[in-house]
Amino acid sequence: MLMATDAIGSDAVHIPVMRARILDLLAVVLKSGRRVHVDGTLGMGGHAEAVLRRFPDVELVGIDRDQQALTMAEARLEPFADRVHLVHAVHDELPEVLDDLGLDYVDSVLLDLGLSSFQIDEVERGFSYSVDSPLDMRMDQSSGRTAAQILNESDPGALVRMLREYGEEKFADRIVRAIVTERDRQPIETSGRLVEIITEAIPATVRRKRHSHPAKRTFQALRIAVNREMETLPAVLPRALDRLDVGGRIAVLSYHSLEDRPVKEAFRDACADTAPAGLPMVPESMAAKFNPVTRGAERPDADEVATNPRSASARLRVIERVRPGPVNRQHATKESR
């Protein structure tokens, strides 16, 4: 893990999703005293800046795997430098980050699982199917396999599973056959070429009926695989819950069902008691350690969606620790096997 150093400027614009609602939900714990807030997906620092401005006594721990976004956030948060700790790490390294800072517990945690506008629009990243660019898709460009390497080197069966599991793509077999045919001729290196392959593989009648871009599901699956998102998310949730102090809150923004499902399950387990069925009363030691704050998942209102269309699919879940002790990890345990 490396501390952020070189600050750089940027003209990129990123509108933090559900910013006002998140601030209101965290205000209960952050409004008084020297509190510690963790932004485990700092990005360009939009949510973090809002927290620091509204709560002048809050100390921020900002974590991100994307060094370029992290340095942009460092420049943005310079006015609050005496209250900010920025760390280059993946969010599932949260316990190690806090240990290095000498923090046993924190008061709030925010995880925004979406890409920033900067990442989507950055030509050299390859996240977007609307711009022709090198197929990279790594949030941390200093390590890991690129999307091009996965496409060109993976077994066809593994690619089919990836598209089905991470993209929920019905035409995974057809798309992978087309990918294999093309890569046998020459490596697939750019997003533009991949979009052409996908578009040609999906029947025209289906393309006309789909409300989204034909490449959307494949690009989502590739991004998830490149960044191991379905490994790090189930790992960070119980670790973040463990480090929340009593009265602390955790807020998670997800953008599709694959992200929302493990969040929903982890939060449901954390808010459940561990007493056997049939007991006339739940012993205090078995009582739920967390309570829900939001009723299910909240969505952005119509005004926000109109202003920031990329927020349309967002789902916000928040729970609060009400008792000390380990949480019920039924689903977290399953994911880690």
From Swiss-Prot:
Family to which the UniProt record says this protein belongs: Belongs to the methyltransferase superfamily. RsmH family.
Any single Gene Ontology cellular-component annotation: cytoplasm
Where it sits in the cell: the answer is: Cytoplasm
Give the domain of life. Answer: Bacteria
Keywords, comma-separated and alphabetical: Cytoplasm, Methyltransferase, rRNA processing, S-adenosyl-L-methionine, Transferase
Q: Which HAMAP family match?
A: 16SrRNA_methyltr_H
- State where S-adenosyl-L-methionine binds: 45-47, 64, 91, 112, 119
InterPro entries xref list: RsmH (IPR002903), SAM-dep_MeTrfase_MraW_recog (IPR023397), SAM-dependent_MTases_sf (IPR029063)
**What is the gene name?**
rsmH
The role this protein plays is:
Specifically methylates the N4 position of cytidine in position 1402 (C1402) of 16S rRNA.
Q: Could you tell me what reaction this enzyme catalyses? A: cytidine(1402) in 16S rRNA + S-adenosyl-L-methionine = N(4)-methylcytidine(1402) in 16S rRNA + S-adenosyl-L-homocysteine + H(+)
Instruction: Write the Enzyme Commission number(s) for this entry.
Output: 2.1.1.199
Q: What is this protein called?
A: Ribosomal RNA small subunit methyltransferase H
Name one matching Pfam family.
Methyltransf_5
What processes does the entry annotate via GO biological process terms?
A: rRNA base methylation
